[in-house]
């Protein structure tokens, strides 16, 4: 049971995608940028909604609350993604439209695997730079969610919770610093993830990943901030 939960935490699927050899420069008018919402969510299991059925993850639910008729959403995320693996996934996906809203929630697997803070900062900065340089994403409003504290879950009870909490806080400080440098909205949901560490109503059946109820708490905080970002 323990092994299967651990593997589920950081194992990732891989999909072969056709890579476009040439990408032409795109001229984007102000009118196009202000048109329909196109939302790109980047992340790991927290953006996937691991353990939940249907479209119960927080990006889909956020999109449902702000979308209009012609709006679209795309999620590039896999359970187990580290920041570097997310960068590789973005590089290997052929984006076919311009996005004007992008979310990032990444880093828990960097912490879980014991990656150094120096490497994580380097990779997170690289991720932000990719978004700023890509013709399909550079016009977007970007927001970043902090890393939840997986130590504050029933699964985390068998780990050193104090150590996990301290490491999560350190990684989140790095994320916040990069966001401040790049004028990106940073949304702290970590404290919400620590609401009740032993309560199973806040996690899925694996005792680790957020339940629909926990995502709802996140969205209560995220939604008004994102609506403000889009004004």
Say what each PLM segment does.
Residues 9-12:
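C-terminal motif of bacterial Sec signal peptides marking the signal peptidase cleavage site
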Residues 46, 80-82, 149, 193:
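Residue-level detector of flexible, active-site-proximal loop/helix-junction positions
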Residues 17-79, 89-96:
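Serine-esterase "nucleophile elbow" of acetyl-processing enzymes
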Residues 1-6:
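Sec-dependent N-terminal signal peptides
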Residues 16-17, 230:
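Membrane-interfacial segments
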Residues 88-231:
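Alpha-helical cap/lid subdomain in secreted, periplasmic
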Residues 78-82, 163-164:
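Short, flexible loop segments at the rims of nucleotide/cofactor-binding pockets, characterized by
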